[in-house]
């Protein structure tokens, strides 16, 4: 329970969500800091004791107390809602609901509720006695007797229930009997309660809306920062809705009357619908700019904002809310509505139809018993499933135990031949994939088979782990010369074979034999069997290194496509190498020839060219991971043979000596290797590969990989110890680089490694001398530049990776639940209408220079006076360091009676930051704005009011616009409003739009404005300059308007009767602030009164003497016209 509806804010910086004095209550707290909060402890306040006290008080004094009846109803509704029953009279439907409480499936009686019910009956008796003197004495006595009998029977039955052991059966039997006997009494009580409630709702709609007991509670957590801003129910308590004023992008505004203030004054309340998370601080939203600005602005020409608060939608009258919010509530899309449906599970079932069924009740024994039993059974089943279900973390082990005998070892041709495909039921697919990883696909065997196989699996796994630690490379079987099988490797390093040709019967026999042996013998003992078997049969042995394998990666490949497939060949030991046929012996001879003498390379190439057709079936394609201009080519092969170059057509080398790309024969696929090191073959002048080198660095007895190395980096690190730059027939530089590091073979290959290392050491000495002569100074410069370029690329890559990690972490943030709230702003109610309606009214003239005049004794037109008030309001707004940013006639209000102007709708208000403003405008080139072009696309519009809309209204915004605008943007908008005031009424919207657009782009105005209203035209040009720094401030404009509207210059004012004498019967006494000096009526010379006034002040001559001659001339020419 929340302690308070409205929480108070501590004054100080310690509070994280500190909000400055937005309301009157907080202003009082700021002044009088001695105010201390006192919270009511609800445990100390017992409702039952209070109700007992009131009933006893009524018994003694026998006086009518309406508060008692209201509290009794409130208490009944609260208890019914807590128990999950209907809030409208369900207490009286079930007779034994008060005496029995349900806790799961156990039921027990409570004596305290009996006393409460007796108190309620006593209260009813007292009520009946009150009205006994008036009417219906006999009826009341009968009802009282029935109630007394009912209470006695109920007490007796409750005592009998306590003595019984089986609570459930007695409870249901008693409930059935009570429903049969007292059904008529309960029906009468329900009908009376419903009738009374309907009468109240029909007579008093406002009272029902204000009854907070009918409204749901708040669903926002009380600990959330959002709860500090809530004042649920404040609108219904203090205001009464009258009518809708208007709706816009920021919300809807209603005219309301204040109930609590004397005279019930009227205000305007704006409703703004927000979707906010529980952790969001509402005061940081853009809507609160309007609140913060109006809190400090006290101006006659600015709409005042009094206070603000937040409420949840369910606490507000729904007819005031927009249709969007009403639809959300109806469709249960909001979070608070979902919780309401959970609390009202049984509300629909609790409503009893008394007119149709006489023997019905809220909960019949049969329906209630069936619902309880079904729920209880479901709970039992759920508990059993939970107990029987294994730990989900070990689900893989459970599946492996069930599928163990089918998945341990398998023959290579089982499930792959055409015969097996024809009979899928008999011969199932042995390969384990993600799709068929279930018990339904593999047939189960007996339980003892599962246990025995799973126990053996664990032992095998432990042995495999030990063997993997000892061995650095896994053992793999060489292919047969006849091409019966070929070995391939999938992405996870698992081994499988691909069937190629005949001998099906023999392979099945060998496969079954291996399965039987592997159940009995460990994996390491199979090496003995390999010695016994022949060379052809030795290839049929299959090692299942991992029980899991992807069936999608293991597919049949025919003999026709073998030349195009990638095969990895690794040498187990020297015995396997010598065991190959003549073709393989030829390869070993070629390798020994390369190790013995460097000069034998040419001869080896010729021999390999002769045997090219015979070796195509067993050749290996070199796999390349990355080919870049500055990086080394990575070839995923540990021991490549020199004859592998026959599959490569073209080998191109960059000018820097780097491998750029290769053209391969056949299909290119990168096969990842368990050993992650980069192996590169060096190139001879004739295009042959020399011995391999690995870009590795020996540190502490271990080799560490050097990735993305360039020639410059390898030269600097000393990795490339030897290299050649020679030219072929085309003049392309090719590099020979040789570096040898010990191969990672088994313990049996140590002798071969020592022999190879001796040969390597001899070659290093010879090639070092040649490398020094080959590298020139020009090549060294190229290597250095490449090294620096790679550093810059690495930095860029690192920055990109960091940014990607930040983006991923941002996307992975857990979403916070959002709640719907309504922000309410209490504002000053402006009488009249907007300036837009005032300008477009039908009584306004559509002819030039036909201005309006008020009833007051005013020397100038009303349009000029309204503009003066507008500039005064902007001056007050800018003085408090705020910018309106959305100044237009729609946001300006005019009173019909007093003709006072007020600026409203500060929803886009912004704080002025002078330091940022000066820096920003120095870097911006201002330009003219054209609505029809795409010039506005370059504007900075980071602070957007509505989705997809530029700040402010496009027709009145300044050219700079966006987030960098300052208070001079309001001056630009005021200049356009002045132009609209000087022009007559526009007949169409397009005419107004064209007039404003011409001024924005070309500064064009009508001729009568230039000639007859020249000072105002000059003022408009100054206010609408493209550079904001050149525009005058609001204070400067206000001072200039004062001079133009100076009442001392009325004697020399120009009258509109001189121009349009035939259209005006009575010329008004007004000013256009000009002096007309004419010799003839056809010639007009306009002279500014401002210049005349300055001359008079400088010469220190009175105005009457200085201009006496001019006045006399004007009077003579105009024949007694008004001054």
UniProtKB/Swiss-Prot annotation:
Basic and acidic residues bias spans: 21-30, 419-428
EC number: 2.7.11.1
Compositionally biased intervals (Acidic residues): 743-754
Start and end residues of each stretch annotated as Disordered: 1-30, 409-493, 572-609, 742-800
Subunit annotation: May form oligomers in response to stress; oligomerization may result in catalytic activity. Interacts with BIP; the interaction is disrupted in response to stress.
Biased composition (Basic residues): 455-477
Protein name, per record: Eukaryotic translation initiation factor 2-alpha kinase PK4
A Pfam family: Pkinase
């Amino acid at each position: 329970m929340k302690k308070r509806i409205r929480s108070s804010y501590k004054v100080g910086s310690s509070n994280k969500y500190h909000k400055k004095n937005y309301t009157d209550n907080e202003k009082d707290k700021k002044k009088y800091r001695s105010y201390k909060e006192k919270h009511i402890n609800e445990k100390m306040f017992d409702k039952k004791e209070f109700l007992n006290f009131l009933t006893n008080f009524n018994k003694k004094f026998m006086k009518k107390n309406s508060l008692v009846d209201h509290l009794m109803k409130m208490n009944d509704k609260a208890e019914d809602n807590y128990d999950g029953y209907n809030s409208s009279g369900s207490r009286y439907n079930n007779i034994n609901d008060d005496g029995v409480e349900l806790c799961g499936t156990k039921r027990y009686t409570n004596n305290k509720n009996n006393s409460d019910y007796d108190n309620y009956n006593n209260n009813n008796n007292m009520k009946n006695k009150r009205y006994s003197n008036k009417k219906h004495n006999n009826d009341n006595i009968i009802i009282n007797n029935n109630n007394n009998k009912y209470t006695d029977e109920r007490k007796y039955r409750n005592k009998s229930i306590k003595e019984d052991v089986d609570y459930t059966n007695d409870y249901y039997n008693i409930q059935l009997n009570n429903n049969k006997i007292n059904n008529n009494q309960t029906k009468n009580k329900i009908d009376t309660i419903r009738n009374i409630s309907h009468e109240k709702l029909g007579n008093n709609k406002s009272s029902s809306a204000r009854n907070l007991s009918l409204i749901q509670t708040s669903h926002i957590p009380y600990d959330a920062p959002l709860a500090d801003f809530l004042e649920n129910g404040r609108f219904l308590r203090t205001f009464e809705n009258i009518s809708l004023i208007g709706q816009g992008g920021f919300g809807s505004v209603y005219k309301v009357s204040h109930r609590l203030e004397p005279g019930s004054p009227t205000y305007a309340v704006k409703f703004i619908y927000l979707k906010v998370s529980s952790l969001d601080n509402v005061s940081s939203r853009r809507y609160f700019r309007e609140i913060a600005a109006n809190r400090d602005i006290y101006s006659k020409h600015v709409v005042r904002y009094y206070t603000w608060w937040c409420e949840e939608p369910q606490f507000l009258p729904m007819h005031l809310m927009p249709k969007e919010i009403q639809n959300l509530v109806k469709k249960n899309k909001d979070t608070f509505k979902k919780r309401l449906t959970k609390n009202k599970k049984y509300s629909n079932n609790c409503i009893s139809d008394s007119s149709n069924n006489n023997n019905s009740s809220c909960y019949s024994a049969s329906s209630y018993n069936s619902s309880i039993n079904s729920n209880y059974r479901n709970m039992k089943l759920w508990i059993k499933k939970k107990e029987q279900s294994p730990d989900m973390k070990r689900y893989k082990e459970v599946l492996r135990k069930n599928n163990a005998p089918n998945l341990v070892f398998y023959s290579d041709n089982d499930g792959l031949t055409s015969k097996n495909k024809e009979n899928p039921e008999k011969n199932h697919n042995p390969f384990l994939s993600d799709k068929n990883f279930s018990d339904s696909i593999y047939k189960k065997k007996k339980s003892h088979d599962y246990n025995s196989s799973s126990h053996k699996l664990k032992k095998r796994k432990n042995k495999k782990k030990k063997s993997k630690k000892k061995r650095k490379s896994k053992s793999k079987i060489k292919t047969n010369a006849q091409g019966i099988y070929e070995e391939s490797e999938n992405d996870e390093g698992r081994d499988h074979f691909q069937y190629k040709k005949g001998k099906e019967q023999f392979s099945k026999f060998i496969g079954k034999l291996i399965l039987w042996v592997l159940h009995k013998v460990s994996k390491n003992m199979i090496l003995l069997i390999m010695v016994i078997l022949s060379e052809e049969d030795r290839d049929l042995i299959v090692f299942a290194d991992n029980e899991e394998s992807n069936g999608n990666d293991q597919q049949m490949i025919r003999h026709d496509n073998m030349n195009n497939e990638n095969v990895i060949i690794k040498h187990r030991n020297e015995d396997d190498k010598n065991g190959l046929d003549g073709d393989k012996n030829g390869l070993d001879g070629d390798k020994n020839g390369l190790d013995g003498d460097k000069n034998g390379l040419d001869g080896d190439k010729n021999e390999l060219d002769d045997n090219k057709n015979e070796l195509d079936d067993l050749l290996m394609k070199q796999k390349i991971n990355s080919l870049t201009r500055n990086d080394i080519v990575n070839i995923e092969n540990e021991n490549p043979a020199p004859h592998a170059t026959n599959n490569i057509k073209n080998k191109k080398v960059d000018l820097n000596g780097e491998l750029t790309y290769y053209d391969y024969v056949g299909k290119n696929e990168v096969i990842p290797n368990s050993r992650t090191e980069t192996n590169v073959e060096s190139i001879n002048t004739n295009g042959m590969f020399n011995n391999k080198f690995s870009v590795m660095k020996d540190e502490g007895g271990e080799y560490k990989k050097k990735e993305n190395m360039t020639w410059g980096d390898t030269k600097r690190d000393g990795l490339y110890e030897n290299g050649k730059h020679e030219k072929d027939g085309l003049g392309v530089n090719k590099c020979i680089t040789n570096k040898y590091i010990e191969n990672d073979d088994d313990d049996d290959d140590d002798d071969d490694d020592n022999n190879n290392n001796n040969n390597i050491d001899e070659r290093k000495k010879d090639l070092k001398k040649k490398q020094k002569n080959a590298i020139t100074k020009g090549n060294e410069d190229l290597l250095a530049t490449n090294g620096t370029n790679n550093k810059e690329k690495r930095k860029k890559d690192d920055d990109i990776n960091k940014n990607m990690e930040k983006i991923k972490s941002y996307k992975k943030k857990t979403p916070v639940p959002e709640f719907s709230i309504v922000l309410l702003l209490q504002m000053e109610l402006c009488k009249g209408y907007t300036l837009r309606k005032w300008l477009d009214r039908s009584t306004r003239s559509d002819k030039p220079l036909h201005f309006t005049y008020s009833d007051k004794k005013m020397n100038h037109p009303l349009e000029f006076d309204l503009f003066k008030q507008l500039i005064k309001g902007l001056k007050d707004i800018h003085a408090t360091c705020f910018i309106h940013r959305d100044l237009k006639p729609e946001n300006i209000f005019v009173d019909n009676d007093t003709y006072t102007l007020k600026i409203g709708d500060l929803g886009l208000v912004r704080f002025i930051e002078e330091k940022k403003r000066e820096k920003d405008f120095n870097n911006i080139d201002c330009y003219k704005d054209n609505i029809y072009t795409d010039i506005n696309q370059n504007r900075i519009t980071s602070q957007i009011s509505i989705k997809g809309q530029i700040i402010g209204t496009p027709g009145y915004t300044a050219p700079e616009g966006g987030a960098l605008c300052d208070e001079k943007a309001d001056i630009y908008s005021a200049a356009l409003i002045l132009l609209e005031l000087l022009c007559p009424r526009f007949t169409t919207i397009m005419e107004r739009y064209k007039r404003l657009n011409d001024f924005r782009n070309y500064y064009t105005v009508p001729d009568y404005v230039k000639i007859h209203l020249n000072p105002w035209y000059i003022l408009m040009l100054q206010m609408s300059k493209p550079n904001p720094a050149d525009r005058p401030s609001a204070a400067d404009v206000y001072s200039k308007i004062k001079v133009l509207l100076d009442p001392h210059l009325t004697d020399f004012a120009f009258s509109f009767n001189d121009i349009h004498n035939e259209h005006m019967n009575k010329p008004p006494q007004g000013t256009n602030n000009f002096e007309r000096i004419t010799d003839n009526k056809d010639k007009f010379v306009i002279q500014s009164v401002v210049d005349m006034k300055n001359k008079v002040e400088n010469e220190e001559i009175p105005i009457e003497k200085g201009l006496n001659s001019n006045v006399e001339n004007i009077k003579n020419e105009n024949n007694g016209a008004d001054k």
